[in-house]
Structure formats: structure tokens, C-alpha cells
Amino acid sequence: MKRYFVTGTDTDCGKTFVTNQLVNYFSSSAAIKPIASGCEYSKNQLVNSDALLHQQQNHLPLEIINPWRFRLPVSPHLSAREDGASIDVHKVADYCLNLQLNDIKKLFIEGAGGLMVPLNEQDTWLDFLKLTRIPVILVVGMKLGCINHTLLTQEVLEINKIKCQGWIANCLDQDMLMLDENISTLEAKLKYPLLARTNYGGKISDICLSSL
């Protein structure tokens, strides 16, 4: 089973939407979101809305999709602390590397926030990737400032020798000035391919998804 880690340029760049689009596009694929904050109680358990969206597609138990759940809608390390818990990045890494799902050929692992979001007082998603070496798919929320955020993310990945399989342009605002020019600028400056583009909540447009 191939595994990909879906990260983004920042919070609310559209990781969950794009991840679901990837699952729709590829047969025999599934998605999980191992860590989520901002969960609410429903039927005596904490539930995350992003994890529920994945469940609607995967039909997997929430315990498999989202084993680490916390209440407050803040950074995972703070939300876990408020719940009297802590996140062990080694356990998260082991879970994502060893999870086996019948008939699934591609597993998309959605992170929480961006690459440098703290999971505890010492570790970030970058440390998770150093442990697992799972290749990254970078979701770029196309908005003012995204070029800077994207190039900074690329630099961190390169310095730490983390493989990036490619990036996806998630077009958030149909009124964004010079959208196509921004995408072209990123294509010229990034060292990995543009895999696909999504337009304002529409279906994913394949550009180079066959490389996955």
C-alpha cells in the first residue's frame, strides 16, 4: 500500500477537501486524519468534522480514521494539553506506517495544519516525516501570500531531505487577482510537479496524478 502525507501551506488551505478529491479520483484508496483538534462530543465520543467527511467516503470506523482527538480548536499540542494528554510522535508514526487496510492501494494521511505545527513541546509534523519518510503531497491554498508560504515549505522539506511527490493548486477564491499567473510562478519556482488543480469547490483537474 502506497502512503502519502497530505500537508498544506497553512490552516484552511483545503487539505481535507483535496484529500477527499484524491480518494474520489483513485479507486482502492482511503484517507485518514490521525490527529485532530476542534472535536465536539456526539453520541458520547469526540468527533472531528474532517474525520467524518473521510468516513463518508471510506466507511471505516472513526477509531481508525482519527485515533487522536482533542476538543479545543487550537494547535494539537495545546489542545492535547488542555485535555490532559500528550501526543507521542513515535506512536503516531508507528500507527501510520503499520496500518493495513484490505483492498486499499493508496492511503492518504492528512495532517493538521501546516508542516511546522507542533504536536508536542518538541515535535512537529516535520519530525513525524523524519521518522516515517512518507512522501508529501503539498496542498497550496491559492490566495495572497501563498507564494511565500509555499516556497518556505519547500525549503524546509529540502533541508530535511523529505521527498515531495508534488503539489496541488486549490483555488479558493474565484475573484483572486492574477490566479493563473500565481500558479505559473509557483510552477517555475517549485522543484516538484503540479499534480492537479481544483477550482472553487469543484472536482479535481488531473495534470500529473498518474505519477502517484
Curated annotation (Swiss-Prot):
Chain positions recorded as Mg(2+) binding sites? T16, D50, E110
HAMAP family in the record? BioD
Name the GO terms of the biological process aspect: biotin biosynthetic process
Q: Which cofactor does it need?
A: Mg(2+)
Q: What is this protein called?
A: ATP-dependent dethiobiotin synthetase BioD
Task: Name the pathway it acts in.
Answer: Cofactor biosynthesis; biotin biosynthesis; biotin from 7,8-diaminononanoate: step 1/2
Which residues does the annotation say bind substrate? S37
Q: Where does ATP bind?
A: D12, C13, G14, K15, T16, F17, D50, E110, G111, A112, G113, N170, C171
A GO MF annotation of the entry reads: magnesium ion binding
The record lists the catalysed reaction(s) as: (7R,8S)-7,8-diammoniononanoate + CO2 + ATP = (4R,5S)-dethiobiotin + ADP + phosphate + 3 H(+)
Taxonomic source organism? Legionella pneumophila (strain Corby)
Q: Where is the active site?
A: K33
Tell me, in a sentence or two, what this protein's role is: Catalyzes a mechanistically unusual reaction, the ATP-dependent insertion of CO2 between the N7 and N8 nitrogen atoms of 7,8-diaminopelargonic acid (DAPA, also called 7,8-diammoniononanoate) to form a ureido ring.
Assembly notes? Homodimer.
State its Enzyme Commission number(s). Answer: 6.3.3.3
Which enzyme class, named as a word? ligase
The text of the family note is: Belongs to the dethiobiotin synthetase family.
For this record, an example GO cellular component is: cytosol
Places the protein is found: Cytoplasm
Look up keyword Manganese and say if it applies.
no
Q: InterPro entries this protein is in? A: DTB_synth_BioD, P-loop_NTPase
Kindly state which keywords UniProt assigns to this record, in alphabetical order: ATP-binding, Biotin biosynthesis, Cytoplasm, Ligase, Magnesium, Metal-binding, Nucleotide-binding
